[in-house]
Structure formats: structure tokens, C-alpha cells
């Protein structure tokens, strides 16, 4: 989305979300640009809380010098994760990115997240890729030479666990 909608990224994201909801739920809902209202309507209709996943949440911040655009984007994220409405429908928010959670003025826009980094990941280290034991099992299952795989991917050590994360 970023490459084609740099100036209006928030509107482009909202349009994509609305398109996905239309595909899933049909035309019976009010598809205004108020995403929280739409998600809340779907929640009330289905009684199923939402899990919102955003990969590379910090893309706009890393790629734009436009402070107004960054502010607009952070306000959008704030509305998804910290608004009164979102408290009703949000079961979980999961975001990935390079930058730590961005602050707006003195208040954190997304301070209700637990941050895990590659350096401080203890509870979720084993989910960053494949553990060495898992790679050994996969090599055995698919008749691959573990030493060759290890030499090719090398892996990395996090919290004392040797991990592999091939692309």
C-alpha cells in the first residue's frame, strides 16, 4: 500500500479494510470511513472479538518526513488500539516493526502494548523461527543433512536458544 499511497496512506488502509469486510460480510453493513464503528458493528453482530495484526507498523514513520502524515497515522493506530470503542471489540493487537512504540507528545499512542525485541524476547524467543531441535527433526523427516542446513542458514543465538529463521 505504501508505494502507491504515500500521501493518503491512512485513507488507503481504511479502504483496504472496508474492502476486506465487504468481501467477508457482504453489503449489509454501514461502510463509512469510521473503521471503529464498522468493527464494533461487526462485533455486535457476530459477538466475536477482533484480533488486529499489523506487520511493519512503523513503515510510515520510517519512510516519511511528513510530520502531519505521521501524526495522522499514529492517531489512526491510537483509535484502533486505545479508543473507548476498541475496548469493546478488541481481543488482541499484534504489531511488528523495527522501531519501538512511537510517542505523540508526552503520551504514548500505543502504551498498552508489551514490547518484545530480538534482544529482550524471553517469553517468545522460541517463536522467532525454528529451534535447532526443530531443524534437526525436519532434516531427519525430509532426509536432509543437518550440518549442511546449519552451514547454509547459520542461525542466531537468542536467550541461549539457537534459532533459525530462513526466508
Can you say where each PLM-predicted feature lies in the sequence?
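Phosphate-binding site recognition
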Residues: 1-167
Amino acid at each position: 500500500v505504501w508505494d502507491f499511497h504515500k500521501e493518503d496512506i491512512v485513507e488507503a488502509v481504511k479502504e483496504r479494510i472496508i474492502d476486506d469486510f465487504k468481501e467477508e460480510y457482504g453489503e449489509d453493513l454501514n461502510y463509512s470511513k469510521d473503521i471503529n464503528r464498522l468493527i464494533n458493528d461487526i462485533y455486535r453482530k457476530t459477538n466475536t472479538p477482533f484480533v488486529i495484526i499489523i506487520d511493519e507498523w512503523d513503515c510510515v514513520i520510517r519512510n516519511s518526513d511528513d510530520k502531519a502524515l505521521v501524526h495522522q497515522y499514529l492517531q489512526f493506530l491510537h483509535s484502533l488500539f486505545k479508543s473507548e470503542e476498541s475496548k469493546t471489540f478488541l481481543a488482541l493487537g499484534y504489531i511488528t516493526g523495527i522501531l519501538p512504540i512511537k510517542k505523540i507528545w508526552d503520551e504514548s499512542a500505543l502504551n498498552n502494548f508489551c514490547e518484545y525485541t530480538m534482544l529482550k524476547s524471553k517469553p517468545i524467543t522460541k517463536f522467532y523461527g525454528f529451534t535447532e531441535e526443530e531443524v534437526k527433526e525436519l532434516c531427519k523427516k525430509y532426509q536432509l543433512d543437518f550440518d549442511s542446513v546449519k552451514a547454509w542458514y547459520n542461525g542466531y543465538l537468542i536467550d541461549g536458544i539457537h534459532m533459525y529463521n530462513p526466508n
